[in-house]
A protein has these predicted regions:
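Aromatic-lined carbohydrate-recognition surfaces of secreted/lumenal glycan-active proteins
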Residues: 1-7, 47-51, 118-122, 157-208, ...
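Catalytic domains of carbohydrate-active enzymes, especially glycoside hydrolases
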Residues: 2-38, 42, 105-116, 216-223, ...
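Glycine-rich, aromatic-flanked loop segments that form ligand/cofactor-binding clefts
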Residues: 27-85, 116-126, 182-194
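A glycine-rich, often tryptophan-bearing local segment used as a flexible ligand/cofactor-contacting loop or short
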Residues: 488-558
Length: 558
């Protein structure tokens, strides 16, 4: 059933022969067929994984694939600087040509007999959007001249939405073409998966990605929820304190990811990573956070498939902490120090037990003691599109750099709580800093409503607002849901209609918001109908008028 697996880029050796069900052989370089052969001989089911936004695609960029250079398809920021994964690997604008190249390269994996293909991390950075390739895509899609996203709210929202669409289009094209190739050539049913960060993490890090839109691609068979210490340790604010809350954040991240498969029959693997991408932390720090992400994943019992350990060679053969002197330049080369040590035996033993446990989590008897089930907080893909305010709205200092300084990013140290406390005090005293705080990686508008419920002990779920249009009865398992349109927007009026219908049938909606979000002013359906914001339309549908008083209102049976 392929309950557990991992991804690996190198050849098999005893330290990474973990006895799981499947292996995702990583990368489509010339060594791929030999690596596939080695793992297959060990009895593993073979998948292939590669990046869809970045990778060693120099032959495409240099014009060796089709005779035309494609360096203009790298992502570029407003200052003309390339947005890179490392100095020789740009993040791509996924053009039609690029999708054809990926399809051609991935046919080799189909020829080698893989059972499934994973294209990971469809990522278009919010700060990107200035390359010639993106300008062309904008003009094709919107049928109007390209507009720089930093100049207006509408331009920001439209550019961000297009970035997510472009990766949806690429995944749709590549998956359909490869499935047809496998069927016609080998009479084989190839499976196709998308490993992706959570909607919450991409919203924090300002990376555009299709997320819930992947549900509408029929040739996608499932996903890997790429949640680990590196995503979940991103600090947030609770009761005015800015700090890492790895368990709580991971719990919410895993929760929103299962919304991609709810009611679809598709597969979801939850990833757990015993370390993280940054090698500068100690083994004690890695284990401390691994325990928290692992427990968080186990608190979502409707998912029982796991990627148990990405890159096991760096766990079982690595020595930490390590020093990365040029990480600011995206050069990931690291060096041992006199503090570097191999994995402690006690941690290795714990991991061996966890790997076995993850293969036996299809448990039918589920009980949450002392908690109230059926409580949710709405989240939407549209939250991605309004994470950066255009020029003229943020008048305060750039808080992003100050938050990063408080976190000692890349140093292996936790948040400097004294520096963070000074920063939070300053934000509370200066209105000019509030919008900058809202657009920071702390993502306070979401965590401000979700974190108190988690801290109280409620087993809450992030609820994918977009899905109320896709699935009848999508909200029927919920008794109470928190909604705010201050950090996201409903795509169409029928979203509000579905929410009101759920309320009338007995649901309780807690709406949080004062209508102050500048993105209410974009050219969207609510403004075209004369509403100042989408909440006014929601309230009117509920029979409360456009501006009901704060308090409790009965609507039907809810």
């Amino acid at each position: 059933e392929e309950l557990t697996g991992y991804q690996a880029s190198g050849e098999i050796r005893p330290s990474v022969d973990l006895g799981c069900d499947f292996i995702m052989v990583y990368g489509i370089d010339p060594t791929m067929p030999e690596r596939i052969r080695q793992y297959r001989e060990k009895g593993y089911v073979i998948h292939l994984m590669t990046g869809i936004a970045w990778g060693e695609y120099q032959e495409y960029l240099d014009g060796k694939w089709d005779g035309r250079k494609h360096w203009d398809e790298g992502q570029v920021d407003r200052n003309g600087k390339d947005v890179i994964h490392n100095p020789t690997v740009p993040y791509m604008v996924p053009t039609v040509s690029f999708s054809e190249y990926l399809t051609d390269r991935l046919k080799v994996a189909v020829d080698a007999g893989v059972e499934a293909i994973h294209v990971e991390e469809p990522e278009f950075w919010d700060k990107s959007g200035y390359s010639e390739a993106f300008k062309r895509e904008y003009e094709i899609y919107y049928k109007e001249p390209w507009k720089p996203q930093h100049e207006s709210l509408d331009a920001q929202y439209k550019c961000a939405r297009l970035k997510a669409y472009l990766y949806k289009r690429t995944i749709d094209r590549v998956s359909a073409a490869l499935k047809e190739y496998a069927k016609v050539t080998y009479q084989k049913d190839l499976r196709f998966y998308v490993p992706t960060h959570s909607l919450l993490n991409y919203t924090q890090w300002k990376i555009m990605s299709p997320e819930a839109e992947l549900i509408s691609i029929p040739t996608v068979d499932g996903y890997i929820a790429q949640i680990w210490t590196g995503t979940s340790r991103e600090a947030n604010v609770y009761e005015g304190v800015y700090k890492e809350r790895t368990f709580e954040t991971a719990y919410l991240e895993y929760g929103v990811m299962q919304e991609l498969v709810k009611g679809t029959g598709r597969r979801m693997w939850f990833l757990n990573d015993p370390i993280e991408d940054l090698p500068s932390y100690t083994w004690e720090n890695y284990e401390y956070n691994y325990r928290r992400t692992a427990v968080a994943s186990l608190l979502h019992p409707h998912i029982w498939h796991y990627e148990i350990c990405p890159w096991p060679h760096r766990v079982f053969d690595g020595r930490y902490p390590r020093f990365q002197p040029r990480i600011a330049e995206k050069i990931e080369t690291s060096f041992e120090t006199d503090q570097s040590k191999p994995i402690p035996q006690s941690y290795s033993t714990l991991l061996s037990g966890m790997f076995q446990l993850f293969g036996d989590m299809e448990q039918r008897d589920i009980l949450f003691e002392g908690g109230t089930d059926g409580v949710g907080v709405f989240m939407s893909d549209s939250g991605l599109f309004q994470r950066t305010f255009p020029d003229g709205i943020v008048d305060g200092e750039e808080l992003g750099d100050r938050f990063r300084a408080a976190m000692h990013k890349n140093s292996g140290n936790p948040v400097d709580e004294e520096a963070a406390a000074r920063l939070m005090k300053e934000i509370g005293e200066k209105d000019s800093l509030m919008y900058d705080f809202i657009q920071s990686a702390a993502f306070p508008n979401f965590f401000g409503v979700a974190m108190p419920l988690v801290k109280y002990g409620l087993p809450i779920h992030p609820v994918q607002l977009d899905n109320v249009r896709r699935f009848a009865g999508y909200l029927e398992d919920y008794k109470c849901i928190v909604l705010s349109y201050e950090y996201m927007k409903p795509d169409a009026p029928d979203v509000n209609a579905a929410v009101v219908s759920w309320i009338r049938e007995g649901g309780t909606l807690i709406y949080v918001g004062d209508g102050s979000d500048p993105f209410h002013k974009i050219d969207a359906w609510w403004g075209q109908r004369g509403y100042a914001n989408p909440a006014e339309h929601l309230f009117e549908l509920a029979g409360l008028g456009r501006d009901p008083k704060e308090g409790v209102h009965e609507v039907g049976a809810g």
